């Protein structure tokens, strides 16, 4: 049987459920190697070492940030020597895994990550060297997800992002920017910017509810109004039509701003004044369940 590598976020090294699930697969005859991350860059190094182990699948065991780091390293490998991606959701929000209908039960998720059908999915590339598999968020949404305290995440899980956002409404400030892409141009002040390959962010909020991960397109949604924010956020996260929510789909877009703005790429912040974001169609293979709603 082909070899599999599990890259496990260091925070989960002592997780007994993970250890049990790994043992069960090994008892079935699966050759499953495990590497634990300690610091930034470990996941990339483990991915690069995977070729020497004749690995067919690399499993990202952690949250959205871990998945991002593994996927970003995979796309850098030659296509002929690129393992498939498996996902073991162990984070706070697990936005990408949840929207893909990957089970949150550790044993079920690990079985899927090893034995599931591999399908081609898109990645999004930012400024030629950064990537996201799920979503890039800007504006108020970025500040919520990057500033939510770890203790609040531990207690409340995905809901912590929304609650922390309510607590921080006094800090709301729009980002002035220009956005253009094929057949689309807009300039103004945006409270929330969502650029989705996947659909949800911030602990289960469907910011880009129509996005697909294999259509060669990104869904862009902008919240531009200055009216009462709670009502607007309800519209954004529920998918309701609202004149202050602008949306489109496009294969690439460019964003320019007179000042630094910060985007959250699957949980990882990236700041600058100029961004080019484009889809890489069929970038990697990912093991997903048959009922994954993000496949067109």
UniProtKB/Swiss-Prot annotation:
Compartments where found: Cytoplasm
EC category: transferase
Lineage top rank: taxon: Bacteria
Keyword Oxidoreductase: no
Native species: Yersinia enterocolitica serotype O:8 / biotype 1B (strain NCTC 13174 / 8081)
Residues the entry annotates as binding Mg(2+): 212, 215, 217
GO molecular function, one term: lipid kinase activity
Lineage: Bacteria, Pseudomonadati, Pseudomonadota, Gammaproteobacteria, Enterobacterales
Xref: Pfam families: DAGK_cat (PF00781), YegS_C (PF19279)
Active site: 268 (proton acceptor)
Function field: Probably phosphorylates lipids; the in vivo substrate is unknown.
Keyword flag Ligase: no
UniProt-recorded name of the protein: Probable lipid kinase YegS-like
Domain DAGKc: 1-130
Note on cofactor: Binds 1 Mg(2+) ion per subunit. Ca(2+) may be able to substitute.
InterPro entries: ATP-NAD_kinase_N (IPR017438), Diacylglycerol/lipid_kinase (IPR005218), Diacylglycerol_kinase_cat_dom (IPR001206), Lip_kinase_YegS (IPR022433), Lipid_Phosphate_FormReg (IPR050187), NAD/diacylglycerol_kinase_sf (IPR016064), YegS/DAGK_C (IPR045540)
NCBIfam families: lip_kinase_YegS, PRK13054.1, YegS/Rv2252/BmrU family lipid kinase
Entry-linked SMART domains: DAGKc (SM00046)
Alphabetized UniProt keyword annotations: ATP-binding, Cytoplasm, Kinase, Lipid biosynthesis, Lipid metabolism, Magnesium, Metal-binding, Nucleotide-binding, Phospholipid biosynthesis, Phospholipid metabolism, Transferase
UniProt-listed Enzyme Commission number(s): 2.7.1.-
Positions of ATP binding: 37, 63-69, 92
């Amino acid at each position: 049987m082909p070899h599999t590598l599990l890259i496990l976020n260091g925070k989960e090294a002592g997780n007994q459920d993970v250890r049990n699930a790994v043992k069960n697969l090994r008892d079935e005859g699966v050759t499953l190697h495990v590497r634990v991350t300690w610091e930034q860059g470990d996941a990339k190094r483990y991915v690069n070492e995977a070729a020497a182990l004749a690995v067919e699948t690399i499993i990202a065991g952690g949250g959205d940030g871990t998945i991002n780091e593994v996927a970003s390293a995979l796309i850098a490998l030659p296509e002929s020597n690129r393992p498939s991606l498996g996902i073991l959701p162990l984070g706070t929000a697990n936005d990408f895994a949840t929207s893909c209908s990957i089970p949150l039960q550790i044993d079920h998720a690990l079985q899927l990550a090893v034995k599931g059908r591999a399908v081609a999915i898109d990645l999004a590339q930012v400024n030629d060297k950064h990537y996201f598999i799920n979503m890039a968020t800007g504006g108020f949404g970025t500040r919520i997800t990057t500033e939510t305290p770890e203790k609040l995440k531990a207690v409340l899980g995905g809901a912590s992002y929304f609650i922390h956002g309510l607590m921080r409404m006094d800090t709301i400030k729009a980002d002035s920017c220009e956005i253009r892409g094929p057949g689309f141009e807009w300039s103004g002040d945006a409270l929330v910017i969502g650029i989705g390959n996947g659909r949800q962010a911030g602990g289960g909020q469907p910011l880009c509810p129509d996005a697909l991960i294999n259509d060669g397109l990104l869904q862009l949604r902008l919240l531009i109004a200055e009216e009462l924010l709670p009502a607007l956020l309800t519209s954004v996260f529920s998918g309701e039509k609202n004149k202050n929510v602008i949306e489109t789909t496009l294969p690439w877009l460019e964003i320019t701003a007179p000042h630094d703005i910060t985007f959250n790429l699957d949980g990882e912040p990236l700041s600058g004044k100029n961004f080019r974001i484009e889809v890489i169609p069929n970038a990697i293979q990912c093991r997903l369940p048959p009922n994954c709603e993000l496949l067109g």
